[in-house]
Curated annotation (Swiss-Prot):
It comes from Wigglesworthia glossinidia brevipalpis. The keyword NADP does not apply. Signal peptide: none annotated. The gene is rpsG. This is Small ribosomal subunit protein uS7. GO terms for molecular function: rRNA binding; structural constituent of ribosome; tRNA binding. The lineage of its organism: Bacteria, Pseudomonadati, Pseudomonadota, Gammaproteobacteria, Enterobacterales. One of the primary rRNA binding proteins, it binds directly to 16S rRNA where it nucleates assembly of the head domain of the 30S subunit. Is located at the subunit interface close to the decoding center, probably blocks exit of the E-site tRNA. Keywords: Ribonucleoprotein, Ribosomal protein, RNA-binding, rRNA-binding, tRNA-binding. The keyword RNA-binding applies. Belongs to the universal ribosomal protein uS7 family.
Length: 156
């Protein structure tokens, strides 16, 4: 492996409406074929619908939903001797956010509703109530880590 210096991450510009970097990242992850304006419209519509329904601030709703979906530990495969072990490791904060966003978007895409903004709004609402596919995914990852706790000493 080459011994090069670590590359600095490019700063992400905050979204134009609410000036949030996390929301901007979410917009970029949701974007398909470079159509950012459509992605922004979907998210803003979903958050506006939730604001009307829950009477809370847009960003508060979004941050709470992300918090409920963020994983704390995950498992990684580690080969020791002739066998492969699933070793539980703690997740970095940047990866926590990325995984949570990805899981919410995947769960929203799998839903059967009319528009993506409705599906996204319902998935975020379910995440706030600790139910829904994204939260189930987090619990599944945590269960795997708990089941393989015996292999934690193989961490590297």
């Amino acid at each position: 492996m080459p011994r090069r210096k670590m590359v600095n991450q490019r700063a992400i510009l905050p979204d134009p409406k609410w000036n949030s970097e996390i929301l901007s990242k979410f917009i970029n992850i949701l974007m398909v074929n470079g159509k950012k304006s459509i992605s922004e419209k979907i998210i803003y519509t979903a958050l506006n619908n939730l604001k009307k329904k829950l009477n809370k601030d847009h960003l508060t709703i979004f941050d709470l939903a992300l918090e409920k979906v963020r994983p704390i530990v995950e498992v990684k495969s580690r080969r020791v001797g002739g066998s492969t072990y699933q070793v539980p490791i703690e997740v970095r904060s940047s990866r926590r956010n990325a995984l949570a966003m990805r899981w919410i978007i995947e769960a929203a895409r799998k839903r059967k509703d009319k528009s993506m903004s409705l599906r996204l709004a319902k998935e975020i609402e379910d995440a706030l109530e600790n139910k829904g596919t994204a939260v189930k995914k987090r619990e599944e990852v945590h269960r795997m880590a708990e089941a393989n706790k015996a292999f934690a000493h193989y961490r590297w």
